[in-house]
Amino acid sequence: LNTSRRFGNNDDGYTPGNISCTLEYDYTDWCMARLAEWLGKEGDRAHFDKRALSYATIFDPESGWFRPRNEKGVFSSLPEKGRLQEGYGCVESNPYQQGWFVPHDVEGMIRLMGGREKVLADLKDMFEKTPGDYLWNDYYNHANEPVHHVPFLFNRLGMPSLTQKWTRDICRNAYHDKVTGLVGNEDVGQMSAWYVLAAA
């Protein structure tokens, strides 16, 4: 609890200048709520469940995506590349990649982003623009972990065939015995663990 209070999102529900931390702290808060629930600490559960939904504080309805806010709550100026700008409030990713990280409230994320059809179209577009070798890129960047859950979002959108299509394509083209056969740093086993789970 002390660590969450010290390093988590501020009282306004976000980490200044940072989309990555804001979304990841929200997920941490959701996990804390589940622990509190298991321990029978209803007050703590309610507190952390509420904090876990603060991802909406950094969603900009005007641009239609997540943007970093400064200490005063003002959105940072959009860069020329918009949500494709690596480092714009994100760690080793861009807002387009990082913005899908609301695993604890996918339905809420879908509503916030404009509904099922809009989200489905956006996800399809992301994968269709991804290079076939899955090396480092601005779209579905399998070379780095922030997007590893994204192909599975099609399941939550009622399109499991697209999860199957893209996970099979990734398994086939991002993992092989050539020079580019492992598209990213193994990072404590995440790349191979993803393959084992997705190929099953």
Task: Describe the residue ranges of each PLM region.
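Active-site core of glycosidic bond-cleaving carbohydrate-active enzymes
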Residues: 1-200
